[in-house]
Amino acid sequence: MAITTPAAITATEAWAQREPKRAEAWFYLGGAYGARAQWRVLRSQQLGAARDGKRIKDALERALALDPRMQEAYFGIGLYRYYADVAPTAAKLLRWLLLLPGGNRVEGLRDMLRARDAGHLLRDEADFQLQVIYLWYEHNVPEALSLLRGLRARRPHNPLFLQLIAETEDTYLHDITASQRTWQALRSARAGDDAELDLGLAELRRLRGNDDV
């Protein structure tokens, strides 16, 4: 990510400068900044991530100004608005010090759902980001699971979705039986030894108090 993202940003910045009236250029520039922002969040680089958030919002708003039909652009804007509102106090103080725009939880979620329902390019990414939001912030576990199961149905060869379903069933619903079935399906899908799967099944055995998992 750290190697390829700068190249993507350089290329899309050049594209936007070369064709400033091309909505797609600004849309993909926002996407390139988004990749770097996620990488910075994972590395706890809050200052850089906050600045990238502003760049994402600006690029996508410019794309929409050039082409209001570009529904996908609403997703990144909504994501910024949502997290800017639900962020911890320290992050909000950082935003204030950097003179970054404020957020709105309700409108941000509305924008994300609008992009998900009307767009085509970002459906899977939107569902993945939304399941995190529903799980962690909206406390709507059934909706999060519904999105994960939809991702699993559309991307059956990606084992991540099965793993997340199993973890959610266990941690949030305390449905050990359902979690057991999902972990076993994941083991079958991977068809081999996997340390993470063994740990998951071992935890289920501990919770059930037997070795029938």
Each language-model region and where it sits:
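Generic helix N-cap/helix-start motif at coil->alpha-helix transitions
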Residues: 88-91, 120-128, 155-163, 191-200
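TPR/Sel1-like alpha-solenoid repeat signature
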Residues: 26-29, 33, 59, 74-77, ...
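Alpha-solenoid helical repeat scaffolds
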Residues: 125-138, 148, 163-172, 184-188, ...
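Structural helix-adjacent loops and short alpha-helical linkers that scaffold large soluble proteins
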Residues: 19-20, 48-49, 139-142, 173-181, ...
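Short coil/linker segments at helix-helix boundaries
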Residues: 1-69, 75-142
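C-terminal intrinsically disordered extensions
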Residues: 57, 63-65, 155-176
